[in-house]
Amino acid sequence: MTDLKPFLAKVASREPLTRDEARAAFDILMSGQATPSQIGGFLMALRVRGESVDEIVGAVTTMRSKMLTVEAPADAIDIVGTGGDASGTYNISTLAALIVAGAGVPVAKHGNRALSSKSGAADNLSALGVNIDVGPEIISRCIAEASVGFMFAQLHHSAMRHVGPSRVELGTRTIFNLLGPLSNPAGVRRQLLGVFSPQWLVPLAEVMRDLGSECVWVVHGDGLDEITTTGITKVAALEDGKIRSFELSPADFGVSPCVLADIKGGDGVANAAALREVLGGAKNAYRDVSLANAAASLVISGKVETIRDGMKLAAHSLDSGATALALDKLIAVSNDID
């Protein structure tokens, strides 16, 4: 079917789509076969009614089928957030990814330029000197040689160009804010996945279970799409096919609580400078929150069993210079394209 109208009529009447229907509908959207009015109406009908797990699974299945893939080790991990929390924090997941890479776990980092903040992962890494405009072969080399590679979302999801203008005109969150982090081009099966609202914790854990992920922690920390050190982080953890919910506090990581202003960032250049300060030995709230996210990621990866062991390994990665070395290698390999 190449006509969106039947699916549009169904969601407009507040009926949920089946997985197959969602897969077909998003194939129409992402193949350029729907008009801007149809795209806008469809996305907002889903948003107002509330997207179901089956609809997200179907949409992700289509998005994954159209993406440019990257070869990565089977044990690679991603640390990613949905964005959209409007917090303007430092690039926490970026530094956490480098720390995890320095600890010897391969990271296939998926990200984009800023949407609701001043600096997304792509902005931050570009300012650090990483060449983000590279193809799958170079990214695979980065992961092999630096233990971390960056996949710039817009280069891997070209089908998104068909819905981009409508999303901009709508100016509000849609299901596509969720789909990107669920569509890692390296096909990772282990993730630390931050979400902008706690309402999505369990549903997205269910989505990742149904899509075959091995271990995923879906987290929301005190308004942030990250693990936070400002207060309580809520977690829905998918492990061995089962989902359990729990909370984490700064004390669980052995760090002092901070306030949001302590981890507020700026643009890509300012955040790159802040990241370099932490690599240089600065002991501050940015270091603490990044270590916390890295520690959880090391648990998810299977490298360690406990958060406290994760904190020790993450701190060693940072303090030994292994994190800085991972960044240096990433910069070198990503720019070695002759």
UniProtKB/Swiss-Prot annotation:
Similarity annotation: Belongs to the anthranilate phosphoribosyltransferase family.
Record's GO cellular component terms: cytosol
EC numbers: 2.4.2.18
Pfam entry (one): Glycos_trans_3N
Cofactor details (free text): Binds 2 magnesium ions per monomer.
UniProt keyword Kinase, yes or no: no
Pathway assignment: Amino-acid biosynthesis; L-tryptophan biosynthesis; L-tryptophan from chorismate: step 2/5
Record note on quaternary structure: Homodimer.
Residues the record lists as binding Mg(2+) 2: D225, E226
Name this protein carries in UniProt: Anthranilate phosphoribosyltransferase
Positions contributing to Mg(2+) 1 binding: S93, E226
Cofactor(s) recorded in Swiss-Prot or TrEMBL: Mg(2+)
Amino-acid positions noted as binding anthranilate 1 in the UniProt annotation, renumbered to this chain: G81, N112
Function, as annotated: Catalyzes the transfer of the phosphoribosyl group of 5-phosphorylribose-1-pyrophosphate (PRPP) to anthranilate to yield N-(5'-phosphoribosyl)-anthranilate (PRA).
InterPro entries, per database record: Anthranilate_Pribosyl_Tfrase (IPR005940), Glycosyl_Trfase_fam3 (IPR000312), Glycosyl_Trfase_fam3_N_dom (IPR017459), Glycosyl_Trfase_fam3_N_dom_sf (IPR036320), Nuc_phospho_transferase (IPR035902)
GO biological process, one term: L-tryptophan biosynthetic process
Catalyzed reactions per annotation: N-(5-phospho-beta-D-ribosyl)anthranilate + diphosphate = 5-phospho-alpha-D-ribose 1-diphosphate + anthranilate
An annotated Gene Ontology molecular function: anthranilate phosphoribosyltransferase activity
Residues binding 5-phospho-alpha-D-ribose 1-diphosphate: 81, 84-85, 89, 91-94, 109-117, 121
Binding sites annotated in the UniProt record for anthranilate 2: R167
